[in-house]
């Protein structure tokens, strides 16, 4: 059968084509040198890439495991504005009506949710305070001998709104004089569907004696700026959530000439507490998590968002003399 291709491709004895005119095969030694050079170049590129990747991994690891070093950070940041001079007019807006948040108390007490208050019999002393401030859904029923009943202000986080409103007999009707201050990110408080503000408004219509305010978006930003100014840390970039204690302390400084805090431990408490000693995080949850486990895990965790309880306490300690804040049960400065 005849081959339809050119003769040079049909003849099995034909040698493969040689190099183009004017070019000769490279000597073996030169080809070997070029192959060695290419291999060295590839090795160099690999080493450089490996070094860059290693640097990135180490940088990410250091960033992820970075711990708040409050003492060194604060020295590099400017001192924040005096909280006593913060504008109060548009900071807290009424949930219903056009009332204005009461703006002055001489002596205030903050009753924390700490189990350190159990067995203290502080109830009568707390009842005599001019203004009392409580947080979230910390109850007084069944604990009044230690924590009292009087509640002038209750600062409530967005995450605790439903826990508070589900128990109106405890939190609304029991102390009708209570003024509620709700705080939360604007995207949670005012989102188009399922707005927490609407939920609180409906509760206000059901309980006409309920006086409630919300922290304005502008003031929420001020709280963030204050945290950054005090710690040198951006709240969002450091994956931090400000705690209700942070909001409560700042609000107390704004409202009160003197502040006494019951049940808050000092920032170094967990490093000195005996390991076998266990204290519930909340006085009303005896089987709840241990306080130091909660503090330490939140302080050092970098996945998700966490409260920096220990860092916040260091800030509060620095405010004690400046704003007339005292601490007891346990006592510290």
Curated annotation (Swiss-Prot):
Q: What is this protein called?
A: Alpha-N-acetylgalactosaminide alpha-2,6-sialyltransferase 6
Compartments reported by the entry: Golgi apparatus membrane
Polar residues: bias regions: 1-12
User: Per the UniProt annotation, where are the glycans attached?
Assistant: 98
Instruction: Spell out the InterPro entries in the cross-references.
Output: Glyco_trans_29, GT29-like_sf
**Which ranges sit in the Lumenal compartment?**
65-333
The UniProt catalytic activity note for this protein reads: a ganglioside GM1b (d18:1(4E)) + CMP-N-acetyl-beta-neuraminate = a ganglioside GD1alpha (d18:1(4E)) + CMP + H(+); a ganglioside GD1a (d18:1(4E)) + CMP-N-acetyl-beta-neuraminate = a ganglioside GT1aalpha (d18:1(4E)) + CMP + H(+); a ganglioside GT1b (d18:1(4E)) + CMP-N-acetyl-beta-neuraminate = a ganglioside GQ1balpha (d18:1(4E)) + CMP + H(+); N-acetyl-alpha-neuraminosyl-(2->3)-beta-D-galactosyl-(1->3)-N-acetyl-beta-D-glucosaminyl-(1->3)-beta-D-galactosyl-(1->4)-beta-D-glucosyl-(1<->1')-N-acyl-sphing-4-enine + CMP-N-acetyl-beta-neuraminate = N-acetyl-alpha-neuraminosyl-(2->3)-beta-D-galactosyl-(1->3)-[N-acetyl-alpha-neuraminosyl-(2->6)]-N-acetyl-beta-D-glucosaminyl-(1->3)-beta-D-galactosyl-(1->4)-beta-D-glucosyl-(1<->1')-N-acyl-sphing-4-enine + CMP + H(+)
């Amino acid at each position: 059968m005849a081959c339809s291709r050119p003769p040079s491709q049909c003849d099995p004895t034909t040698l493969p084509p040689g190099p183009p005119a004017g070019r000769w095969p490279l000597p073996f030694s030169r080809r070997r040198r070029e192959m060695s050079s290419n291999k060295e170049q590839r090795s160099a590129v690999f080493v450089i890439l490996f070094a860059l990747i290693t640097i990135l991994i180490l940088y990410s690891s250091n960033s992820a495991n970075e711990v708040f070093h409050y003492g060194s950070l604060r020295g590099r940041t400017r001192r924040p504005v005096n909280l006593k001079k913060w504008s109060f007019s548009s900071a807290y807006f009424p949930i219903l009506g056009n009332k204005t948040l009461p703006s002055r108390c001489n002596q205030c007490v903050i009753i924390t949710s700490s189990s350190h208050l159990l067995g203290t019999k502080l109830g009568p002393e707390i009842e005599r305070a001019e203004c009392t401030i409580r947080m979230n859904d910390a109850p007084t029923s069944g604990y009044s001998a230690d924590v009292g009943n009087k509640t002038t202000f209750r600062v409530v986080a967005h995450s605790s709104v439903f826990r508070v409103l589900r128990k109106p007999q405890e939190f609304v009707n029991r102390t009708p004089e209570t003024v509620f201050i709700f705080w939360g990110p604007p995207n949670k408080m005012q989102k188009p569907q399922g707005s927490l503000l609407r939920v609180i408004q409906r509760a206000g219509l059901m309980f006409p004696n309920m006086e409630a305010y919300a922290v304005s978006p502008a003031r929420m930003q001020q709280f963030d700026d204050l945290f950054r100014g005090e710690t040198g840390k951006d709240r969002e970039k450091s994956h931090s959530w400000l705690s209700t204690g942070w909001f409560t302390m700042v609000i107390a400084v704004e409202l009160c000439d003197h502040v006494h805090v019951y049940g808050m431990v000092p920032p170094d408490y967990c490093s000195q507490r005996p390991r076998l000693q266990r204290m519930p995080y909340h006085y009303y949850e005896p089987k709840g998590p241990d306080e130091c486990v909660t503090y330490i895990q939140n302080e050092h965790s970098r996945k998700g968002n966490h409260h920096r309880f220990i860092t916040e306490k260091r800030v509060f300690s620095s405010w004690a003399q400046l704003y007339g804040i005292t601490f007891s049960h346990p006592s510290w400065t």
